[in-house]
Amino acid sequence: MIPKIIHQLWVGPKKPPHDLMKTWRDNHPDWEYMFWNEESIKEHFPNGLYNQKQYDEMPEWNGKCDIARYEILDKFGGFFVDADAVSLRPLDDYLLENDSFSCYENEFLRGQLIACGYFGAQRDCELVRHNIDAIHELSGNTLWEGGVSAWKTVGPVLMSRLVHQY
């Protein structure tokens, strides 16, 4: 069962979109809410993330979020949603009865890619663990040096491949 915890993460120099983030708290008053940033990651992972090396080498902020999101969900479980997403209504409780859930990215822009920016999972979820392990296999920063975007290496492309593989 997926716990009623909403996770949102913001890293980088820009200010978080607090108005958008508030829509999640407003529509889910009975859920625990955890806002994550560089400091809270260090607080909850005092020995660093399992993929700390990949996190530190990732040049894109959204890629850093993807790397951290899997490890946060592995440890706490819950629902991870991008900080720039709007909640229009509460999530349905039946979603929480699964090991994990997500949705597709915009079908017109990215076809059949599974969105990791809207992803719920129970603690110790096998799919989350596969994402963490796949990221750990990325050697150095060779993938990002070639200009390959994070959404192709640690984001939706990786998630989609692993969902279909497992």
What are these regions (language model features)?
Residues M1-C65, V81-Y166:
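Glycosyltransferase-associated regions of secretory-pathway enzymes
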Residues D66-G78:
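Small-residue hinge/turn detector
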